[in-house]
């Protein structure tokens, strides 16, 4: 899993602290240096690491820690609390519209696994009693519509498509279709690009303006490390995203992207893809990482 390497390194720092009994400021300073290295090696952004270590150090050298009977436990607790806070504290839930259908716009770069993961998310919510509709707004990638129809069929979720038309018109027509057919949740599978470009962002802004989605979720591959943060910031600047879905968290990614995204964009990670299968998705719980 993405956080395993980081957990191992932090545990070895904690083990060293536990073996000491009383702690001095110097002990904490050394431990913080190791924590800093572990986070940087896990691909957490430098600015995030710097702020994190400063926060933990400030709390850890207080009298309540140094004079406590279990100073090591206090330091470990502070590190864990600050890590959880960094990723957003509690699980951030989806926002549902007061008047259905709730429109969820899925955005991201090509190759992030957007089409598969939009279907995974629709499947998860269907299991929770929702009636989702998938709308094919990616008219550029030749196989995108077929791919969405295939995963829709596998999950028994309807797919609305109009071929290679105008994505804004397709999105609007998809929502009308949902109203007529009793779908209370609409997922717009939008086009990705290999890299961020103006044409893509303009198209996505036009879709957003036309349908006013309740959620704009950015799908990001956890394996791309530091690039994930730049991607998240670019999409957030253009679209004011409401949250992030991290995919491939089951891989050997270093996990730093997850720690950096929330801290730098202020937007929560809402869901995590944890495997290849269509049911391998779950709400992201920072406190369980």
PLM segments and residue spans:
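Conserved residues at beta->alpha junctions
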Residues: 108, 136-139, 191, 219-222, ...
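Short, small-residue-enriched loops and turns at beta-alpha junctions
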Residues: 112, 140-142, 167-168, 192-196, ...
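Conserved phosphate-handling catalytic cores of large alpha/beta enzymes
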Residues: 172-175, 183, 195, 201-209, ...
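Primarily NTPase-proximal linker/entry elements flanking Walker-type ATP/GTP-binding cores
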Residues: 6-137, 144-164, 170-190
């Amino acid at each position: 899993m993405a956080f395993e390497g980081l957990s191992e390194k932090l545990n070895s720092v904690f083990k060293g602290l536990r073996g000491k009994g009383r702690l001095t400021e110097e002990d904490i300073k050394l431990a913080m240096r190791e924590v800093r290295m572990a986070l940087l090696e896990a691909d957490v952004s430098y600015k995030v690491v710097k702020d994190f270590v400063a926060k933990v150090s400030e709390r850890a050298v207080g009298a309540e820690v140094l004079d406590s009977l279990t100073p090591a436990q206090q330091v470990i607790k502070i590190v864990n609390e600050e890590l959880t806070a960094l990723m957003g504290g509690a699980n951030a839930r989806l926002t549902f519209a007061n008047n259905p259908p709730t429109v969820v716009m899925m955005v991201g770069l090509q190759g992030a696994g957007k089409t598969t993961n939009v279907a995974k998310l629709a499947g998860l919510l269907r299991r929770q009693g929702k009636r989702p509709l998938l709308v094919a707004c990616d008219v550029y990638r030749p196989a995108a519509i077929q791919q969405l129809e295939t995963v829709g069929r596998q999950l028994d979720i309807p797919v609305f498509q109009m071929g290679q038309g105008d994505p804004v018109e397709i999105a609007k027509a998809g929502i009308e279709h949902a109203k007529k057919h009793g779908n209370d949740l609409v997922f717009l599978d939008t086009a990705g690009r290999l890299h961020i470009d103006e044409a893509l962002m303009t198209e996505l802004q036009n879709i957003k303006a036309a349908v006013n989605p309740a959620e704009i979720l950015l799908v990001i591959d956890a394996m791309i490390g530091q690039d994930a943060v730049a991607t998240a910031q670019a999409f957030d600047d253009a679209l004011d995203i409401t949250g992030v879905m991290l995919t491939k968290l089951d891989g050997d990614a270093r996990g730093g992207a997850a720690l950096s995204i929330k801290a730098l964009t202020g937007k929560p990670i809402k869901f995590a893809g944890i495997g290849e299968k269509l049911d391998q998705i779950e709400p992201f719980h920072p406190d369980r990482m």
